[in-house]
Protein backbone atom coordinates (compact mmCIF):
# COMPACT_ATOMS: atom_id res chain seq x y z
CA UNK A 1 0.00 0.00 0.00
CA UNK A 2 1.34 3.40 -0.98
CA UNK A 3 0.91 6.90 0.40
CA UNK A 4 1.73 9.83 -1.89
CA UNK A 5 3.52 12.94 -0.65
CA UNK A 6 3.24 15.89 -3.05
CA UNK A 7 5.33 19.07 -2.91
CA UNK A 8 4.85 21.73 -5.58
CA UNK A 9 6.47 25.08 -6.37
CA UNK A 10 4.25 27.67 -8.02
CA UNK A 11 0.98 25.84 -7.26
CA UNK A 12 -0.77 23.50 -4.87
CA UNK A 13 -0.69 19.82 -5.69
CA UNK A 14 -2.52 16.81 -4.33
CA UNK A 15 -2.65 13.17 -5.26
CA UNK A 16 -6.01 11.85 -6.42
CA UNK A 17 -6.11 8.32 -5.07
CA UNK A 18 -9.36 7.51 -6.87
CA UNK A 19 -7.85 8.30 -10.28
CA UNK A 20 -4.22 7.66 -9.32
CA UNK A 21 -3.00 10.93 -10.76
CA UNK A 22 -1.77 14.37 -9.73
CA UNK A 23 -4.09 17.38 -9.47
CA UNK A 24 -2.58 20.86 -9.67
CA UNK A 25 -4.55 23.92 -8.51
CA UNK A 26 -4.06 27.50 -7.32
CA UNK A 27 -1.34 28.12 -9.91
CA UNK A 28 0.73 31.23 -9.15
CA UNK A 29 3.60 30.82 -11.62
CA UNK A 30 4.23 29.97 -15.25
CA UNK A 31 6.87 27.55 -14.06
CA UNK A 32 5.29 24.85 -11.90
CA UNK A 33 7.28 21.90 -10.65
CA UNK A 34 6.07 19.09 -8.41
CA UNK A 35 7.88 16.38 -6.55
CA UNK A 36 5.95 13.18 -5.76
CA UNK A 37 7.21 10.60 -3.31
CA UNK A 38 5.49 7.28 -2.76
CA UNK A 39 5.89 5.72 0.65
CA UNK A 40 5.05 2.14 1.50
CA UNK A 41 2.91 2.11 4.62
CA UNK A 42 1.34 -0.69 6.67
CA UNK A 43 -2.36 -1.37 6.28
CA UNK A 44 -4.33 0.34 9.05
CA UNK A 45 -7.99 -0.62 9.25
CA UNK A 46 -10.19 2.42 9.75
CA UNK A 47 -12.26 0.85 12.53
CA UNK A 48 -9.18 -0.06 14.57
CA UNK A 49 -7.65 3.35 13.99
CA UNK A 50 -10.71 5.24 15.26
CA UNK A 51 -10.94 3.03 18.34
CA UNK A 52 -7.28 3.83 19.05
CA UNK A 53 -8.21 7.52 19.24
CA UNK A 54 -10.40 6.99 22.32
CA UNK A 55 -10.40 10.04 24.62
CA UNK A 56 -7.92 11.89 22.41
CA UNK A 57 -8.64 15.45 21.32
CA UNK A 58 -9.79 15.60 17.71
CA UNK A 59 -10.26 19.16 16.49
CA UNK A 60 -12.89 20.74 18.73
CA UNK A 61 -14.08 17.37 19.97
CA UNK A 62 -12.92 13.89 20.81
CA UNK A 63 -13.70 10.18 20.54
CA UNK A 64 -15.73 8.74 23.43
CA UNK A 65 -17.02 5.26 24.23
CA UNK A 66 -20.78 5.59 24.77
CA UNK A 67 -22.77 2.77 23.19
CA UNK A 68 -20.10 2.73 20.51
CA UNK A 69 -16.94 4.70 19.83
CA UNK A 70 -18.31 8.09 18.80
CA UNK A 71 -17.14 11.54 17.80
CA UNK A 72 -18.51 14.32 19.99
CA UNK A 73 -18.08 18.10 19.86
CA UNK A 74 -18.67 21.09 17.63
CA UNK A 75 -16.21 20.21 14.87
CA UNK A 76 -14.12 17.11 15.51
CA UNK A 77 -11.70 15.70 12.96
CA UNK A 78 -14.11 13.13 11.57
CA UNK A 79 -14.16 14.06 7.88
CA UNK A 80 -13.80 11.24 5.38
CA UNK A 81 -13.55 11.52 1.60
CA UNK A 82 -16.08 9.00 0.34
CA UNK A 83 -17.93 8.84 -2.98
CA UNK A 84 -15.87 11.83 -4.19
CA UNK A 85 -17.39 14.11 -1.54
CA UNK A 86 -17.25 14.84 2.16
CA UNK A 87 -18.87 12.48 4.63
CA UNK A 88 -18.39 12.43 8.40
CA UNK A 89 -17.74 9.56 10.75
CA UNK A 90 -20.39 8.98 13.41
CA UNK A 91 -18.33 6.26 15.04
CA UNK A 92 -17.46 2.57 15.28
CA UNK A 93 -20.11 0.08 16.40
CA UNK A 94 -20.40 -3.62 17.19
CA UNK A 95 -23.08 -6.08 16.14
CA UNK A 96 -25.61 -4.74 18.66
CA UNK A 97 -26.01 -1.78 16.31
CA UNK A 98 -25.68 -3.37 12.87
CA UNK A 99 -26.17 -7.12 13.23
CA UNK A 100 -22.93 -8.21 11.52
CA UNK A 101 -21.59 -10.77 13.97
CA UNK A 102 -18.09 -10.26 15.33
CA UNK A 103 -17.40 -7.08 13.36
CA UNK A 104 -16.72 -3.48 14.35
CA UNK A 105 -18.08 -1.31 11.54
CA UNK A 106 -17.50 2.38 10.87
CA UNK A 107 -20.72 4.34 10.48
CA UNK A 108 -20.65 7.48 8.32
CA UNK A 109 -23.13 10.19 7.33
CA UNK A 110 -23.13 12.40 4.25
CA UNK A 111 -21.89 15.87 5.17
CA UNK A 112 -24.73 17.59 3.32
CA UNK A 113 -28.39 16.71 2.96
CA UNK A 114 -29.61 15.36 -0.35
CA UNK A 115 -32.88 17.29 -0.60
CA UNK A 116 -36.15 17.80 1.20
CA UNK A 117 -37.67 14.33 0.82
CA UNK A 118 -40.77 12.67 2.22
CA UNK A 119 -39.92 9.92 4.70
CA UNK A 120 -42.84 8.02 3.27
CA UNK A 121 -45.13 9.23 0.51
CA UNK A 122 -48.05 7.27 2.02
CA UNK A 123 -47.65 9.07 5.39
CA UNK A 124 -47.04 5.89 7.38
CA UNK A 125 -44.02 5.36 9.64
CA UNK A 126 -42.90 1.84 8.72
CA UNK A 127 -39.35 2.30 7.39
CA UNK A 128 -39.29 -1.19 5.89
CA UNK A 129 -41.93 -0.18 3.32
CA UNK A 130 -41.18 3.56 3.13
CA UNK A 131 -40.58 5.46 -0.09
CA UNK A 132 -37.36 7.00 1.26
CA UNK A 133 -35.87 3.59 2.09
CA UNK A 134 -36.69 2.41 -1.44
CA UNK A 135 -35.21 5.56 -2.95
CA UNK A 136 -31.97 5.48 -0.95
CA UNK A 137 -31.38 1.75 -1.41
CA UNK A 138 -32.44 1.86 -5.06
CA UNK A 139 -31.71 4.87 -7.25
CA UNK A 140 -29.32 6.54 -4.78
CA UNK A 141 -27.30 3.41 -4.01
CA UNK A 142 -27.06 2.52 -7.71
CA UNK A 143 -26.36 6.08 -8.93
CA UNK A 144 -29.48 6.21 -11.10
CA UNK A 145 -32.08 8.85 -11.89
CA UNK A 146 -34.87 8.07 -9.46
CA UNK A 147 -37.07 11.06 -10.25
CA UNK A 148 -39.66 8.86 -11.96
CA UNK A 149 -39.15 5.85 -9.69
CA UNK A 150 -42.39 6.36 -7.78
CA UNK A 151 -40.44 7.07 -4.58
CA UNK A 152 -39.15 10.60 -5.23
CA UNK A 153 -41.40 13.03 -3.41
CA UNK A 154 -40.87 16.26 -1.53
CA UNK A 155 -44.33 16.09 0.00
CA UNK A 156 -46.77 13.19 0.01
CA UNK A 157 -47.40 12.30 -3.65
CA UNK A 158 -48.15 15.85 -4.74
CA UNK A 159 -44.62 17.25 -5.14
CA UNK A 160 -41.94 15.39 -7.08
CA UNK A 161 -38.41 16.14 -5.88
CA UNK A 162 -35.09 16.12 -7.74
CA UNK A 163 -33.80 12.56 -7.44
CA UNK A 164 -31.29 12.39 -10.27
CA UNK A 165 -28.53 10.50 -8.49
CA UNK A 166 -26.43 9.59 -11.52
CA UNK A 167 -23.68 11.86 -10.16
CA UNK A 168 -24.72 12.39 -6.54
CA UNK A 169 -25.49 8.74 -5.85
CA UNK A 170 -23.05 6.06 -4.72
CA UNK A 171 -20.58 5.52 -7.56
CA UNK A 172 -19.55 2.02 -8.58
CA UNK A 173 -16.05 2.23 -7.11
CA UNK A 174 -17.47 2.82 -3.64
CA UNK A 175 -20.41 0.42 -3.46
CA UNK A 176 -18.19 -2.51 -2.56
CA UNK A 177 -17.09 -0.67 0.59
CA UNK A 178 -20.64 -0.56 1.98
CA UNK A 179 -21.90 -3.31 4.27
CA UNK A 180 -25.44 -4.65 4.16
CA UNK A 181 -26.61 -4.37 7.75
CA UNK A 182 -29.57 -4.57 10.08
CA UNK A 183 -31.33 -1.27 10.75
CA UNK A 184 -33.24 -1.28 14.03
CA UNK A 185 -36.69 0.27 13.86
CA UNK A 186 -37.82 0.33 17.48
CA UNK A 187 -40.08 3.26 18.30
CA UNK A 188 -40.94 5.47 21.24
CA UNK A 189 -44.25 6.81 22.51
CA UNK A 190 -42.90 10.35 23.18
CA UNK A 191 -45.14 10.71 26.22
CA UNK A 192 -42.08 11.70 28.26
CA UNK A 193 -38.71 13.17 27.33
CA UNK A 194 -35.75 10.89 26.65
CA UNK A 195 -31.98 11.12 26.91
CA UNK A 196 -29.48 9.80 24.37
CA UNK A 197 -29.04 6.59 26.36
CA UNK A 198 -32.79 6.04 26.65
CA UNK A 199 -33.29 6.61 22.93
CA UNK A 200 -30.49 4.17 22.13
CA UNK A 201 -32.46 1.50 23.96
CA UNK A 202 -35.78 2.39 22.35
CA UNK A 203 -34.25 2.31 18.87
CA UNK A 204 -33.10 -1.27 19.38
CA UNK A 205 -36.27 -2.34 21.14
CA UNK A 206 -39.40 -3.99 19.80
CA UNK A 207 -42.02 -1.39 20.71
CA UNK A 208 -43.59 -0.29 17.43
CA UNK A 209 -46.98 0.74 16.14
CA UNK A 210 -49.17 -2.25 15.29
CA UNK A 211 -47.96 -3.99 12.14
CA UNK A 212 -44.69 -2.09 11.79
CA UNK A 213 -41.37 -3.90 11.40
CA UNK A 214 -38.87 -3.89 14.27
CA UNK A 215 -35.89 -4.18 11.91
CA UNK A 216 -34.93 -4.44 8.27
CA UNK A 217 -31.77 -4.91 6.21
CA UNK A 218 -30.21 -2.63 3.64
CA UNK A 219 -27.23 -0.54 2.66
CA UNK A 220 -28.47 2.98 3.33
CA UNK A 221 -30.38 4.38 6.29
CA UNK A 222 -30.63 7.58 8.31
CA UNK A 223 -29.20 8.72 11.63
CA UNK A 224 -30.87 7.74 14.87
CA UNK A 225 -31.94 10.30 17.48
CA UNK A 226 -29.25 8.86 19.76
CA UNK A 227 -26.58 9.53 17.10
CA UNK A 228 -27.49 13.20 17.31
CA UNK A 229 -27.76 13.12 21.09
CA UNK A 230 -24.31 11.64 21.58
CA UNK A 231 -22.73 14.06 19.09
CA UNK A 232 -22.82 17.00 21.52
CA UNK A 233 -19.81 17.76 23.70
CA UNK A 234 -20.66 16.05 26.99
CA UNK A 235 -18.66 18.54 29.05
CA UNK A 236 -20.94 21.29 27.71
CA UNK A 237 -24.28 19.45 27.57
CA UNK A 238 -24.79 16.78 30.23
CA UNK A 239 -25.84 13.34 28.99
CA UNK A 240 -28.81 13.47 31.38
CA UNK A 241 -30.28 16.26 29.22
CA UNK A 242 -33.30 15.08 27.27
CA UNK A 243 -33.20 15.52 23.50
CA UNK A 244 -36.26 17.79 23.54
CA UNK A 245 -34.12 20.34 25.42
CA UNK A 246 -31.15 20.54 23.06
CA UNK A 247 -32.03 23.93 21.54
CA UNK A 248 -29.23 25.86 23.21
CA UNK A 249 -25.69 26.92 22.51
CA UNK A 250 -24.38 24.48 25.10
CA UNK A 251 -26.14 21.51 23.47
CA UNK A 252 -27.00 21.95 19.78
CA UNK A 253 -24.26 24.56 19.50
CA UNK A 254 -21.71 21.93 20.52
CA UNK A 255 -22.79 19.23 18.06
CA UNK A 256 -21.11 18.56 14.74
CA UNK A 257 -24.36 17.06 13.41
CA UNK A 258 -26.37 20.23 14.00
CA UNK A 259 -26.80 23.00 11.45
CA UNK A 260 -28.48 21.46 8.38
CA UNK A 261 -32.04 22.58 9.13
CA UNK A 262 -34.94 20.20 9.58
CA UNK A 263 -33.78 16.60 9.21
CA UNK A 264 -35.27 13.15 9.36
CA UNK A 265 -34.12 10.41 11.71
CA UNK A 266 -34.81 6.71 11.28
CA UNK A 267 -36.93 6.30 14.40
CA UNK A 268 -40.75 6.30 14.31
CA UNK A 269 -43.25 7.11 17.00
CA UNK A 270 -44.84 3.99 18.44
CA UNK A 271 -47.96 5.95 19.43
CA UNK A 272 -49.42 6.22 15.95
CA UNK A 273 -48.90 5.17 12.34
CA UNK A 274 -47.53 8.37 10.83
CA UNK A 275 -45.17 10.35 13.09
CA UNK A 276 -41.37 10.09 12.81
CA UNK A 277 -38.82 11.75 15.08
CA UNK A 278 -37.06 14.64 13.37
CA UNK A 279 -34.35 17.15 14.16
CA UNK A 280 -35.69 20.70 14.38
CA UNK A 281 -33.76 23.60 12.90
CA UNK A 282 -33.41 25.01 16.43
CA UNK A 283 -31.44 21.94 17.46
CA UNK A 284 -33.83 19.80 19.45
CA UNK A 285 -35.43 16.48 18.55
CA UNK A 286 -39.13 17.03 17.92
CA UNK A 287 -40.79 15.17 20.77
CA UNK A 288 -44.11 14.91 18.97
CA UNK A 289 -42.53 13.70 15.75
CA UNK A 290 -43.33 14.97 12.26
CA UNK A 291 -45.73 13.64 9.68
CA UNK A 292 -43.90 11.11 7.48
CA UNK A 293 -45.16 12.71 4.27
CA UNK A 294 -43.40 16.05 4.93
CA UNK A 295 -40.25 16.87 2.97
CA UNK A 296 -37.31 17.23 5.36
CA UNK A 297 -33.56 17.13 4.81
CA UNK A 298 -32.35 13.57 4.35
CA UNK A 299 -28.72 12.63 4.94
CA UNK A 300 -27.75 9.10 3.89
CA UNK A 301 -26.05 6.99 6.55
CA UNK A 302 -24.13 3.76 5.93
CA UNK A 303 -21.69 1.32 7.48
CA UNK A 304 -18.33 0.66 5.88
CA UNK A 305 -17.16 -2.93 5.49
CA UNK A 306 -14.72 -4.01 8.21
CA UNK A 307 -11.96 -4.47 5.60
CA UNK A 308 -11.87 -0.75 4.69
CA UNK A 309 -8.51 0.74 5.61
CA UNK A 310 -7.04 4.22 5.97
CA UNK A 311 -4.24 5.33 3.66
CA UNK A 312 -4.02 9.06 4.35
CA UNK A 313 -5.49 12.02 6.19
CA UNK A 314 -6.02 13.17 9.77
CA UNK A 315 -9.78 13.68 9.60
CA UNK A 316 -9.69 17.46 9.35
CA UNK A 317 -11.64 19.33 6.68
CA UNK A 318 -8.48 20.11 4.71
CA UNK A 319 -7.05 16.63 5.16
CA UNK A 320 -9.94 14.13 5.34
CA UNK A 321 -9.39 10.43 5.75
CA UNK A 322 -8.74 8.66 2.46
CA UNK A 323 -9.82 5.04 2.48
CA UNK A 324 -9.56 1.92 0.35
CA UNK A 325 -10.66 -1.68 0.52
Feature annotation, model-predicted:
Residues 1-325:
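Long, domain-scale functional regions
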